[in-house]
């Protein structure tokens, strides 16, 4: 899936509509985690320094087509301004005369941020009129929002059909990392899949079983697999109607000689709440009135033993009820262990969600090979499904050897020119 990127187009003096994913958490009117904002800075910086006039666009939360003051993008614009060291204004609405005028006033290298796209119901409906209104702002479209690439919305698909459409650096990196993960992983290859339900991850489990050597299962979905093994799970979250599917997955793993690791001991609690009584017990002895909320130490030892040999690891989903600190130990411990594996040279890719939160809360993010900005998008990509927001972008043409050589020369010349432009000017007396 080789798409043209922002380096493949002359953006100087052009209005460029950049779809970013600034769907970040807010606390007390401030951005509490700016990792998604920072992830698109390379694309924004490149376009600005090459003279583009940037119209940045994102959604925030789920306002259901209505204006909600708590989901306005002003805090995001303020954080972006701090990161860039320059003022990035946010418009009062994604549409309207005031926004049109603000776009027209942009100069080369300047940018603005449109107000929350999802304040308009037309965004999620991929409404062609709304898409055209967005397209009218710009001459070029760039998608750098991998987290929404699996959604066919007006700002991800509709507009991309109306303008020359290119990939941003973040989107390109996400696709490259996930493609490499599934196509040419260093072995042994281990996958850790957690989270609440097996039903939402059946397809990705099937795809992973074609590739991995070890499959580690945790979180609520592991409870359904414990049922498939004939164990009881008390009052734990489980999908009883998916037990046969879990048996099928286990049989498929055995057929493909994939080692499956399930909890052998678990943390159980009387209630899934803070301050409740909890204890660690063998997975065969779960009381009828208790809930499984985390994996135990023996299970972590099994997981770490398998992961110590892995040269490639993919992780998606927590191992327990991560939102409650007392039940987050397993997830946090695996995050720390995987950081040490990455330090030792293993490729460790994290596929979004609460796995990312466990990493960031412990200050481990910089140690991982890649942390995806799109949980749902990364899973759909690994399932082998087309991502609408990627498919619609322009494909890179297949070049002849002579054309490749010429393109390489042009790229090298451009890189030299860019390096020269960054050198400080030589000052002094004129000759003679």
Please report, for each region that a protein language model flagged, where it lies by residue.
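Active-site loop-to-helix "anion-binding N-cap" substructures in soluble metabolic enzymes
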Residues: 1-400, 404, 409-412, 422-432
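Intrinsically disordered, low-complexity, charge-biased segments
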Residues: 415-419
């Amino acid at each position: 899936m080789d798409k043209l990127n922002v380096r493949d187009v002359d953006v100087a003096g052009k209005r460029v509509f950049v779809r970013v994913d600034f769907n970040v958490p807010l606390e007390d009117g401030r951005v509490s985690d700016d990792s998604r904002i920072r992830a698109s800075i390379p694309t924004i910086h490149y376009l600005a320094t090459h003279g583009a006039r940037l119209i940045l666009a994102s959604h925030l939360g789920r306002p259901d087509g209505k204006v909600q003051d708590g989901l306005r993008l002003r805090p995001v614009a303020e954080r972006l301004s701090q990161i860039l060291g320059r003022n990035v204004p946010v418009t009062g609405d994604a549409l309207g005369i005031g926004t049109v005028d603000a776009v027209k006033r942009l100069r080369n290298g300047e940018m603005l941020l449109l107000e929350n796209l999802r304040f308009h119901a037309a965004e999620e409906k991929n409404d062609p009129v709304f898409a055209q209104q967005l397209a009218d702002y710009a001459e070029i479209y760039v998608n750098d929002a991998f987290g929404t690439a699996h959604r066919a919305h007006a700002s991800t698909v509709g507009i991309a059909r109306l303008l020359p459409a290119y990939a941003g650096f973040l989107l390109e990196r996400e696709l490259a990392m996930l493609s490499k993960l599934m196509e040419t992983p260093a072995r042994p290859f281990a996958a850790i899949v957690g989270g609440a339900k097996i039903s939402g991850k059946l397809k990705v489990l099937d795809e992973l079983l074609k590739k991995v050597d070890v499959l580690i299962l945790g979180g609520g979905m592991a409870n359904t697999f414990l049922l498939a093994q004939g164990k009881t799970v008390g009052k734990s979250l489980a999908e009883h109607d998916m037990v046969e599917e879990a048996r099928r997955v286990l049989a498929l793993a055995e057929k493909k000689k994939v080692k499956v690791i399930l909890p052998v001991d678990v943390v159980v609690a009387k209630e899934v709440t803070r301050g409740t009584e909890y204890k660690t017990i063998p997975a065969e002895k779960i009381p009828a009135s208790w809930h499984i909320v985390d994996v135990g130490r023996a299970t972590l030892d099994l997981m770490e033993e398998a992961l110590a040999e892995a040269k490639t690891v993919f992780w998606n989903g927590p191992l327990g009820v991560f939102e409650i600190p007392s039940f987050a130990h397993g997830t946090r411990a695996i995050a720390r262990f995987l950081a040490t594996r990455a330090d030792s040279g293993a490729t460790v890719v994290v596929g979004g969600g609460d796995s990312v939160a466990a990493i960031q809360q412990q200050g481990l993010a910089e140690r991982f090979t890649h942390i995806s900005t799109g949980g749902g998008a990364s899973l759909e990509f690994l399932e082998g499904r087309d991502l609408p927001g990627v498919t619609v972008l322009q494909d890179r043409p297949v070049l002849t050897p002579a054309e490749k050589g010429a393109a390489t020369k042009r790229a090298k010349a451009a890189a030299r020119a860019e390096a020269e432009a960054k050198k400080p000017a030589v000052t002094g007396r004129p000759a003679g």
